[in-house]
Swiss-Prot record:
It comes from Hippoglossus hippoglossus (Atlantic halibut). The modification N6-lactoyllysine is found at K10. It is found in: Nucleus; Chromosome. Acetylation is not necessary for the antibacterial activity. The modification N6-(2-hydroxyisobutyryl)lysine is found at K6, K10, K37. This is Histone H2A.
Length: 52
């Protein structure tokens, strides 16, 4: 008996777009996808579409 009681799991937070996190108007997720698909580099960092 571990005696943990009725512990509820944490509820998942509401999805927040990367554009709203960065305070931008253009779609950061879409730009990131296009950077990856466009063969611009082997690896694309998470901040690349924000600073572009």
């Amino acid at each position: 008996m571990s005696g943990r009681g009725k512990t509820g799991g944490k509820a998942r937070a509401k999805a927040k777009t990367r554009s709203s996190r960065a305070g931008l108007q253009f779609p950061v997720g879409r730009v990131h996808r296009l950077l990856r698909k466009g063969n611009y580099a082997h690896r694309v960092g998470a901040g690349a579409p924000v600073y572009l």
